Amino acid sequence: ELGDTIVAGRYDAAITGVELRNLTVFKEKIYDEIKEIPGKLIVKEYPTRSANIQTIKNHVEKLKRRDFIPDMIIVDYGDLIRPENGGKDEKRHQLETIYEELRGLAQICECPLWTASQTNRSGLNAEVITMESISEAFNKCFVADFIFTVSRTVEDKNNNTGRIFIAKNRNGPDGLVYPLFMDTSSVCIKVLSQTGETVNDIIQKSS
């Protein structure tokens, strides 16, 4: 959804702790820190709704021919991928198919694949965002192995806080809420507690 230079800048900030507004000022410091990190990060941008799953597959194959095998793929974001059938189906069916194809791509590449999705209006200022708040097609939730949500109220945004909710975990516990520190100026996100709370715990505290 964002331009490749903006995405790359956010990674620079997250890795080095330099605020986004100061990235150009501390270019040498950033370069010195990042060059010591093993591995590579490839950021590929496509115009909105121009890329389908085959487009991404072709790019991955091109990288493999250059001896770059991805350990993880992040798609920003699945809902904006162009359907293979030209958009003839209802949107909810399109999204379900897109997410199934993303899962298939992860299996082919033998690596984790992450993407994001939007919430509906009920999740805009919710204390905890559950799967019921995920917009458009609920069926895409059935495809995922792991789903977490990030919620931030107006007060959270002022205090650099938030919550992460484990909405689905095919291979482990779910239904847990963890407090977050979240400073968007430097893209710093930290889970503050190793012991999760349930949604009911959060509701009782806020009532």
Description of each model-found segment:
Residues 71-115:
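Helical hairpin unit composed of two closely spaced alpha helices linked by a short loop
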Residues 44-46, 75-78, 116-117, 150-151, ...:
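Generic beta-strand/beta-sheet core signal
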Residues 36-41, 102-113, 143-145:
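A structural motif corresponding to the C-terminal end of an alpha-helix
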Residues 2-69, 83, 177-179:
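Cytosolic-facing regulatory segments adjacent to core modules
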Residues 4, 95, 99, 134-140:
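Amphipathic alpha-helical segments in well-structured domains
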Residues 1, 43, 76, 102, ...:
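Conserved RecA-like P-loop NTPase ATPase core
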Residues 32, 53-73, 86-89, 107-109, ...:
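C-terminal regions of RecA-like/P-loop NTPase motor modules
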